Amino acid sequence: VMSDLDFERKHAEDLQRLRGLRLLDDDFMNKVFEDKACAEFLLQIILQRTDLRVQRAHGQHDIKNLQGRSVRLDILAVDEADRVYNIEVQRSDKGAGVKRARYNSSLIDANVTEPGDEYEKLNETYVIFITEHDVLGDGHPIYHIDRTVRETGALFGDESHILYVNAQIKDDTALGQLMHDFSCTSAEEMHYQILADRVRYFKEDTEGVATMCKVMEDMRNEAAREA
């Protein structure tokens, strides 16, 4: 049983860790963007679509693969046109490999269709990796990956999209300012009010801080169980 002293120490460590968390840290990002308005704002900037309206957003969404093993997505959101968005943040390049993007994309396809459904009913999907480093390595702020017909260069049109957003580029564009915000530890330094308010809530508000401490405690317990 954890002693009071031990609990105090762990709690102090959590508070210290919370101060250093950024939107590039998945356990923090999950909480911020499970808020529908924040998820909508994020997608509007990344996809340059001000008309995009999010119906629902879930943080840490568990999705089963065909073997029944559970895979946890950072954020899963659905818009009013039933387009499905998976948003992942990755600090290590290892977790953001191209096969991982393909895997997430196929998982979503397998999970949103019911057996016997028409294939035509497959939702349009976006798998979006926001990476701390320029994983694809060509210096672009954003990379759009779509299947194309090699002979004609035309889009294949299967409505499956993969995007990589490079958080290294923090210029004065809307996306660059968003990436700046993803790299901040304090709400004060952030450009976008909607994100700053939510970050401030989890870092400075008593209730928000308690929520985040609970998240960190749950993660510790889960790690201990899996060890």
Which positions does each model-derived feature cover?
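Zn2+-dependent peptidoglycan hydrolase active-site motif and core
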Residues: 64-72, 76-205
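Exposed, low-complexity/repetitive linear segments and helix-based recognition motifs
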Residues: 59, 71, 143, 214-215, ...
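A short acidic/basic microdomain associated with nuclease active sites
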Residues: 52-66
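Acidic-basic catalytic patches of nuclease active cores, encompassing PD-(D/E)XK
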Residues: 22-56
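Short, well-ordered alpha-helical segments
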Residues: 32, 36-41, 99, 193, ...
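Short, charged alpha-helical interaction segments and adjacent helix-coil junctions
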Residues: 2-19, 23, 27, 46, ...
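Short secondary-structure capping/turn segments at boundaries of alpha-helices and beta-strands
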Residues: 28-29, 42, 60-64, 72-75
